[in-house]
């Protein structure tokens, strides 16, 4: 379980001023992914969250499964409707204005002072998620914090619609 295995590293990395809450649905969520790369995504997002909360705060990471409609995937420029793993990373930091939010995935774009960041962390996050056929949704308001929602396609039978319920075929949850 990626989220459980990375929790000790994140706790150590974010320090004592930031409270970390990591949770996931009780049923395992299966995706086809490079675990090391997804851990890097979580480390980069946690690092940015820590920096956005210099006086401390709460960093929440939650895993779930969602059904994406054609309308949603079309409006977000993604390829397919269907069932996705959703990893939500939310902080209560200083947040971003719209002008900043629209540029955060550009390589070398940073709001950090010289010597504190390269501007590559979120560009890498974006690239890793795209490499896994996923997509990101970011919401942020100055003074209220930032939420990253990472959508990754589920593995196995969940990639196709559930069959019609008949005596011969019954749908089973993707996480079993």
List where the protein language model places each region.
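Core catalytic ATP-binding domain of two-component histidine kinases
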Residues: 1-176
């Amino acid at each position: 379980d990626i989220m459980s295995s990375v929790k000790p590293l994140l706790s150590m990395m974010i320090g004592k001023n930031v409270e970390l809450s990591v949770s996931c649905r009780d049923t395992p969520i299966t995706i086809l992914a490079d675990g090391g790369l997804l851990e890097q995504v979580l480390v980069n997002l946690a690092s940015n969250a820590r920096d956005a909360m210099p006086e401390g705060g709460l960093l929440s990471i939650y895993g779930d499964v969602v059904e994406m409609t054609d309308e949603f995937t079309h409006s977000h420029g993604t390829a397919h409707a269907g069932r996705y793993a959703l990893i939500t990373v939310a902080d209560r930091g200083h947040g971003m204005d719209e002008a900043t939010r629209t540029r955060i995935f550009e390589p070398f774009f940073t709001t950090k002072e010289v010597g504190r960041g390269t501007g590559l962390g979120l560009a890498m996050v974006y690239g890793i998620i795209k490499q896994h056929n996923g997509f990101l949704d970011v919401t942020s308001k100055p003074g209220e914090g930032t939420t990253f929602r990472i959508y990754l396609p589920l593995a196995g039978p969940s990639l196709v619609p559930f069959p019609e319920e008949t005596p011969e075929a019954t749908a089973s949850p993707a996480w079993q």
